[in-house]
């Protein structure tokens, strides 16, 4: 976390307006211990602490964290439990012809399905929250 704080401080001291800055969590290099087989291991709690400490928007990159279509979808759904301000998801009409990151590119159909699932989860969560308040 100190590393993130130092980077934010350094960038802001260089004259960047805070309103033009956001943070992006892409996970951390897994090293040897990688039980989920992700390309990078996410630390969602750390990302939320940094969002709170810096008061900057925090987005999440499930594409580079997951490393494969199946894992991108899975980790995007996991990230939905946190208050990220957005997601960076690589989408290509023909992933096999993508110029980079071929294995983690979703098709438009997969992307639409993921968004629908995330939307349904959010609606269900809001409904449950409203019921609890009644």
Q: Where do the protein language model's features map onto the residues?
A:
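C-terminal helical cap(s) of enzyme catalytic domains, especially alpha/beta-barrels
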Residues: 93-127
């Amino acid at each position: 976390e100190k590393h993130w704080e130092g980077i934010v401080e350094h960038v802001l001291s260089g004259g960047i307006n805070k309103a033009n800055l956001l943070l992006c969590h892409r996970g951390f290099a897994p090293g040897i211990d990688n039980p989920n087989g992700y390309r990078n291991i996410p630390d969602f709690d750390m990302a939320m602490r940094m969002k709170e400490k810096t008061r900057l928007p925090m987005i999440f990159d499930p594409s580079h964290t997951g490393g494969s279509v199946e894992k991108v979808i899975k980790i995007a759904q996991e990230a939905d439990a946190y208050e990220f301000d957005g997601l960076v998801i690589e989408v290509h009409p023909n992933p096999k012809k993508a110029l980079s990151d071929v294995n983690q590119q979703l098709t438009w159909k997969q992307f639409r399905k993921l968004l629908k699932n995330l939307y349904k989860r959010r609606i269900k969560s809001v409904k449950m929250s409203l019921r609890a308040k009644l």
